Amino acid sequence: LANGPMREEIEREGGLKLIYIDPPFAVGADFGFDIEIGGEKAEKRQTVIEEIAYRDTWERGMSSYLSMLYDRIKLMHSLLAEGGSIYVHCDWRVNNAVKLLLDEVFGSSNFQREIVWRIGWISGYKSAAPNWIRNHDNIYYYTKGTNFTFNKEYIPYPAGYTRRDGAVPEGAGYPIEDTWNCSELDKLDSIQIMSFSGEKVGYPTQKNENLLARIIRASSKEGDLVADFFGGSGTTAAVAEKLGRKWITCDLGRFGIHTTRKRMIGVQRELKAAGKDYRAFEVLNLGKYERQFFMDNMVNGARKKKENAYLSLILQAYHAQPVESFKHLHGRKAGRMVHVGPLDVPVTKQRVLEIFEECKTKLITKVDVLGFEFEMGLMPNVFDELREQGVDMVAKYIPKDVFDPRAVEKGQVKFFDVAYLDAKAHVTKRKVKIELVDFVTKYTQDDLEDVEKQLKKGAKVVIENGRIVKLNKDKDGFVERTVLTESWQDWVDYWAIDFNYRDKKEVIRVPQP
């Protein structure tokens, strides 16, 4: 977005016409989420990169938060079209400081309104504050210049409404003010308060669609490009698609991206069923750009130097000791040899067989094979065959966390065994039926024995070795284990099939500056 093909595409569209952001404004915000299996909930904790990103955001309190936000808002300002609008959603913890920041970037003369959004009817512990009950967020509305789009919104008059003189009122209704959800006619309650809303997707900071629809209708036109750079559950994208706008949404959290993707597929189906047009969308992963750092300029002596730096980095993150005098083996850890796969291509069957031959020659029986990607078909058949021939090979993914030096230094990088899907093809004449047989994962987040020791009384759900297990400890210290993942299908949230798949590389050419 700062400088590349995506920015060029935005500029070709004439720039962003509308930006809505709801940046994190609570210390301790994270990317964890709940997985529901068999009526029980297990927490899927955030990745190392996600955890560090928010830890850094609040490392020095408000100053580090504003530093993070300032850089991003400056970039958003540069991507915004002349006459474009931005809405920044925040609350009492940061609103004064954020407004000063927006004045700095956009200019105080381009401040249009401070919208006060009453969150909704509250009860229970939320109503037990020692003084006035806090019940609103702030949304700051700025524009880039004075020639901006604004489509005035109205609340329709109630059915049967007449003026004092008995006349039927003219016009579309009451013009909407800068205080929202403050009357029976203006219903914009928080999605968190509307407990039975069908919109809910289980995301902790989700905003309701009516709130975003009001903003998008007012400050953009059909076909305009709308963006949300703290995408969360994808509400902005979902509403923009329904209202005929083009959209871009970004998020650091994997669950946010997954939730948005799933939600947008649902929006497409909804629009298709209604006979309305909808657009295809793409999920772009920035994870490979860290790898690009090591691949750039790998020529002559620089190539060898970077290869050595890459091997050293991966071995350090894996807590392995480097070894020499081997062709395909690079390290040793806990009685197992370690092979570090290439940076720019998948680990292939040919490479695995070469590792196997060297192990047989050197009388080595245990190897961990680390890689960013693996050739299709390696798991489980090839590894099972080599295990039967005397070499126990385990394939593990190299996570993108390895490119964050803070995560490596703190020993927080985790390498997970490669998960794989087992499928069978049934061919009948000119028809092919694909049967999904199994999904094999050894994903581990907890240690059952450790959790049992620490659990004083009650229940806890843990994830270990591809299983979700509920532990229940009674007052006498007896622990009952219940496996909640009875079927491999319990791990699958949804399936997606690319019917237009083509087995060829997508090439994006970027002109040299």
Positions of predicted regions on the chain:
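A short glycine-rich, Lys/Arg-flanked "PGG" loop and its adjoining helix->strand segment in the class I
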Residues: 70-82, 361
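Mobile active-site "lid"/loop adjacent to the S-adenosyl-L-methionine
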Residues: 24-68, 83
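Accessory, often C-terminal, charged low-complexity segments
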Residues: 3-13, 17, 77, 92, ...
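Glycine-rich phosphate-binding "P-loop"
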Residues: 52-67, 197-203, 339-344
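Extended, hydrophobic alpha-helical segments in both membrane/secreted and soluble proteins
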Residues: 16-26, 65, 69-73, 86, ...
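Active-site-adjacent bridging/hinge elements
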Residues: 42-51, 181-192, 230-240
